Amino acid sequence: MACSWTFLWLLWIAMVAVLLFFLRGPLKISESLESVSATSYFNNLTPKFYVALTGTSSLVSGIILIFEWWYFKNNAGVEQGEDEGSDNEESIDNPKTVPECKVWRNPMALFRAAEYNRFRKETNSEPLTYYDMNLSAQDHQSLFMCDEDQGRAEYEIMQVAWRERESEQRIQTARTALAINSECASALVLLAEEDTETVAQAENVLRRALRAIENTLSTYSNNQIASYGQNGDTVRKRDLTIQTYIKRRLAMCARKQGRLREAIKGFRDLSREQSLSTLLSVQDNLIEACLEVQAYADVQNLLVRYDGYGTSCSYDQREPRSAAMSYTSALLKVRAVAENFRCPSESSVRRGLSSAEQTAIEALTRAMEFNPHVPPYLLEIRAMIMPPEHFLKRGDSEALAYAFFHIQHWKRIDGALQLLSIVWKDFVPKVNKDTHAFSSQLESADKELLPAWHEQSAFPQTESTLGMLIQTFACLAICILAVLSQQVPSSYGEMLRQIVTSGVQMYENSMNTFSQWAPNNIIPYLASKPVSVPEI
């Protein structure tokens, strides 16, 4: 940064020297120095000269002061961290360290055939990336396969089916497995996910898969059931995992078709199985379903259970578990004050706020610190796309996974989005300062999970070097023009007319040159092929 400022000052001096060199004729600098002595020169100066000199120097000083303030505002914390960070690294753990780029499965993932494929047919755009689908294939292999499947033809075929890249090949392979064993639950799950046109059809296939896996589990003896927790029967564990997965997807089908009580009951039953429900993140599905029926007391109890919301222990000293947890807890606090909240949007210092309003603002700020990509989607500043099947915590993918299903809950509460907008306007300048809270690896990893046609959200939004240089040159040009307009108004006006005339001539010459080799219908030709942007 110091090198760039040195370069700018040297550039300033060089521009002034070049300007004086080219204006030595109109300004008659050499004649003035030869014919007029210093004493007579200063005696002949009018008060207008001193007024112009004072104004110009004040302008230059103000510009320098603004640049210095901008520099120290953006780099003071970095320099202080470099000096003092080494003394505290070993003794104090920073609670806001950059998280690892660990990929998490989206518990609210849509059905590929019934939902993702409909979007692809309507927009002719791929909603999922191959990397995202490959991660799903790995998840299915780990959930639905085990080492004891060797020698069982249908399960060996399903191992091949999950690895197939194309959907048609996976479907054909699953049908081959069903031809061998009509009660193969994993094959039915694959067909429900990728070979059904509607959610209702997917639900029917999943119910058939549930009956098949329950028949398989009923064949286990009581001794095997008693020894499962201790000895870890891998085959039974695999079958229980398949059963839990199918029940969760059936509850999601009920939620999508408006049977909310049935969906909540299914999610509650699954949440009692701690190990499997935690593995599949059933609590996120349960929280969203309770929000849909406006059971806010149940949502608060779930947050206390899964994220420590409302407790006075170490909640304020640690990071939230996910964007869904942090923004849901903020929504509950905003709900109590949003309708009667009155705050000027341009004021960053709020006075006379109640404790509930301050708590709501702090909760929103905390949620934005965890994932600042969410508010632009909730406020509909950025275009929404289909959520991916996997996401990265604190990334744009997690923001899409949350906002896609929860934006309706924010709209339902009067004043919630208005309060979110007010806090967001004050938060954007702050998050752009913190260049160390978000890793560049997170942004590049998100690109693998999101489609290429999606404009990815990035924080902090730093200014480009080209923009900074353009702003600097504009300030320098304004200062030079101000000096010339005060010192030599007649010569300055003539020179300005020459510059404008030269610019117009250059524009006309360039347009004539372009029209000589470009076809006459190039504008209609370009306008006839607009870029198609996928719409939801």
Curated annotation (Swiss-Prot):
Topology term for the membrane: Multi-pass membrane protein
Compartments where found: Membrane
Entry keyword annotation includes Coiled coil: yes
Coiled-coil region: 192-219
Residues spanning the membrane: 3-23, 49-69, 464-484
GO cellular component: membrane
UniProt-listed InterPro entries: ST7
Major subcellular site: membrane
Superkingdom in the source lineage: Eukaryota
CDD domains the UniProt entry points to: ST7
Key words, A-Z: Coiled coil, Membrane, Transmembrane, Transmembrane helix
Family: Belongs to the ST7 family.
Protein name (record): Protein ST7 homolog
Native source species: Caenorhabditis briggsae
